[in-house]
């Protein structure tokens, strides 16, 4: 699928990402409310078994709990909705990583479309993350803030950037246009 040329591979990845349906989960939506069609979705397992409530039973009016499927490879973990809907993405993410940041090990990928999240820490992440953004947009750099409040712009547009989001406060700079991003991380 990819050929090793970062700009060309980002165009291919953008085409893949543009085919997905984006709908942020409740916690991600609270962090950054978005318009329909935009959002942030997790690709990787989760400890949360509960997914949503189903439609009320006609006879009893009780709404059943709909739970995620167990991850067969991880005890006590469940498959994210994106893993179930788009299982082919794992190989795509691994191939992209192998070409462009081959020594980085990841277990999860956060997929974002027009998700201009404000300052935050990635409390659940373990170690460093790699972020890369693609699309036709201006602005939208990944901004990091050091302990003294100094802000540094990381140009993540078709350019992988690595930092520890669990220890370094960061956000997406305001942008205009269509912006997709991937955050590869361990959890």
Give the residues covered by each predicted segment.
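Fe(II)/2-oxoglutarate oxygenase catalytic core
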Residues: 1-161, 166-187
């Amino acid at each position: 699928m990819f050929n090793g040329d970062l700009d060309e591979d980002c165009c291919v990845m953008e085409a893949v990402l543009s085919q997905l349906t984006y709908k942020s989960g409740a916690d991600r939506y609270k962090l950054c409310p978005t318009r329909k069609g935009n959002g942030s979705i997790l690709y990787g397992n989760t400890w949360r078994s509960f997914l949503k409530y189903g439609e009320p039973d006609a006879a009893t009016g009780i709404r059943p709990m709909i739970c995620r499927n167990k991850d067969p490879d991880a005890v006590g973990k469940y498959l994210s909705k994106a893993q179930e809907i788009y299982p082919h993405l794992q190989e795509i993410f691994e191939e992209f990583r192998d070409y462009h940041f081959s020594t980085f090990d990841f277990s999860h990928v956060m997929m974002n479309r027009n998700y201009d999240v404000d300052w935050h820490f990635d409390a659940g992440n373990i170690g460093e993350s790699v972020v890369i953004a693609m699309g036709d947009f201006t602005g939208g750099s990944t901004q990091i803030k050091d302990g003294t409040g100094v802000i540094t712009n990381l140009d993540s547009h078709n350019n992988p950037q690595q930092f520890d989001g669990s220890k370094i406060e960061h956000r997406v700079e305001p942008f205009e246009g269509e912006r997709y991003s991937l955050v590869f991380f361990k959890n």
